[in-house]
Amino acid sequence: MYDTSGNYSVCDERPFPDPYLMQRVGWLRAEVARAERRGRLLRPGDEDEARRMPDPMPTPEAFALLGMFLGLFPPAVIFFRLFDYGFTPRHGLPIFLLCLGMNVVCFAVGRAMGAFVGRKIDGLWQRPWPLLLAASAALGLLWGVVTGGLGGAVFFGFGAPVGAAAAAPVGTLAFALFAPLHRLLARDGMIEARHAWPLVFGVTGLIAALIASPHVF
């Protein structure tokens, strides 16, 4: 059969594949493969234990708590050691306000960055332990650079590199400690709140104690 001009045969036409359909098929295949991999690697009974948790906490929320308190306590200890947090007459109100401003920024940014790290880590629970440790340390380093840099920027801008350099080892060590412990206690990506809170305060307290120790810094 030919068109009215007789130029080509309509019967020879073949339908072009729908690009959106191909995208959806590709996405579906990836999701199926991810679900199969997750099913193979989950510990027996993890899903049942997660459903039975009285107060489950998702991974991003647990890491957000860690980031929040890491942005609160370790910087406060540093400010006390350097400036007495502005509580002495020698430093006065301006130093106190600067320390408080930097602490507030670290607190807020630390929480946001902690949630970001948690979302990234959430996809790595079924990966090998060395990969989880390396990823958590690298993401902790990123947390420290961003949180410390923005917090230090309050100190007239030039405190940003100092803050980033000070917070980078804090984030690296804290998240490298927290991630494997969280993995041991979590079930299907969920951890009970009664386990998460002591874990957060334990890691944060350890970091703060190391900073406060004259034998370490």
Q: Predicted segments — roles?
A:
Residues 2-217:
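Juxtamembrane/disordered regions of integral membrane proteins
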